[in-house]
Amino acid sequence: MLRIADKTFDSHLFTGTGKFASSQLMVEAIRASGSQLVTLAMKRVDLRQHNDAILEPLIAAGVTLLPNTSGAKTAEEAIFAAHLAREALGTNWLKLEIHPDARWLLPDPIETLKAAETLVQQGFVVLPYCGADPVLCKRLEEVGCAAVMPLGAPIGSNQGLETRAMLEIIIQQATVPVVVDAGIGVPSHAAQALEMGADAVLVNTAIAVADDPVNMAKAFRLAVEAGLLARQSGPGSRSHFAHATSPLAGFLEASA
């Protein structure tokens, strides 16, 4: 069971809504993933009506919506988008995204921290997308963010956990949930994130652009479950030396 702020989730896999070939395929994949928290870019939906092609099926699916501020380049733009989302969707939950460079889509740490502090004070449950910077993640936690969402690699790159060393530090020091966001390309990446201690992963591109998004969503669901179970089972420690699983010494001595 995963708890973030006032909500609990059985699934440790969060999903996105972008890049799917159709809204129907998007919903089928989300259902197959078992995800209970789904991100939604405000720039992609018509907030004036709940029968929007993306919004309506998500509401019908009964998932928790996590509007994001993707497209915002400054703290001010993100705060403005956050208030639009709260008014339209009736939720205080927000994935804070500020990335001024359209080529790399890397989060702006200064603007993100600035916006996070303001939004928390205004009553939002803030989940910030950020670089895998342990110092920044701690600062975001200190200003009241409900979770932190450090990247594994650039958005949509499918490179996996390129920031693993920094993610391990973030996980070790965090007192709020850590959700690895961006760059996860195959189910094994998700399993590794859960094994190393992440509380959840957010996956969008890897599912949406797969030849079979529904089955890929199932694969991610199973990978996250496997990674979590492996961590909870207490894996053995690593060693530089070999350790025989079936020592022969006693057997040979007895047979001499």
Swiss-Prot record:
Keywords: Cytoplasm, Schiff base, Thiamine biosynthesis, Transferase. This is Thiazole synthase. The gene is thiG. Its EC number is 2.8.1.10. One of its GO terms (molecular function) is thiazole synthase activity. Homotetramer. Forms heterodimers with either ThiH or ThiS. The keyword Kinase does not apply. Pathway: Cofactor biosynthesis; thiamine diphosphate biosynthesis. Disulfide bonds: none annotated. It is an enzyme of class 2 (transferase). It catalyses: [ThiS sulfur-carrier protein]-C-terminal-Gly-aminoethanethioate + 2-iminoacetate + 1-deoxy-D-xylulose 5-phosphate = [ThiS sulfur-carrier protein]-C-terminal Gly-Gly + 2-[(2R,5Z)-2-carboxy-4-methylthiazol-5(2H)-ylidene]ethyl phosphate + 2 H2O + H(+). One of its GO terms (biological process) is thiamine diphosphate biosynthetic process. One of its GO terms (cellular component) is cytoplasm. It is found in: Cytoplasm. CDD domains: ThiG (cd04728).
